């Protein structure tokens, strides 16, 4: 169980299924047994925008390379006019106005990851799943992204489940850390 506004970290060696677990929690894959519930409702019953959003480790794989980034942002759950929230998130994520006219291949990994995070922070997002989202970035960009993301999730009571190989990072950003190890039997 992940409580509203809680920050949970997940650590495990490579190949232990951390990304698969997040895919199940996001509804991209079905579990072999059991079910994922959001406020008591099975996740597969949600239609349209699902309040569980995933931010992938490789942002270039989560966007359509043929779409301008303004369209990528518009895929998020925003009020019709874009709203104050979207503007605030874009500012917190350091998204420059001129980037919106570009295509994904025209941005760096860090710049593109900022778009992916902003898109995931739609107005109805309740749980954010973060899969090694800053592993490929320099330390300054990592700090900027995590600072903005934690500020936004805290102010809106959004739960965060973060996967990382960095114990130090998870200790700084999470209230609880789950260590996955080999399961026998």
PLM features: residue spans?
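Conserved ABC ATPase signature
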Residues: 103-107, 111
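Q-loop/switch helix immediately C-terminal to the Walker
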Residues: 58, 65-81
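Helix-to-loop junction immediately C-terminal to a conserved catalytic motif
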Residues: 26
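Walker B catalytic motif
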Residues: 103, 132-133
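The feature captures the beta-strand-to-loop junction immediately N-terminal to the Walker
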Residues: 11-13
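Hydrophobic anchor residue at the start of the ABC signature
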Residues: 117, 129, 145
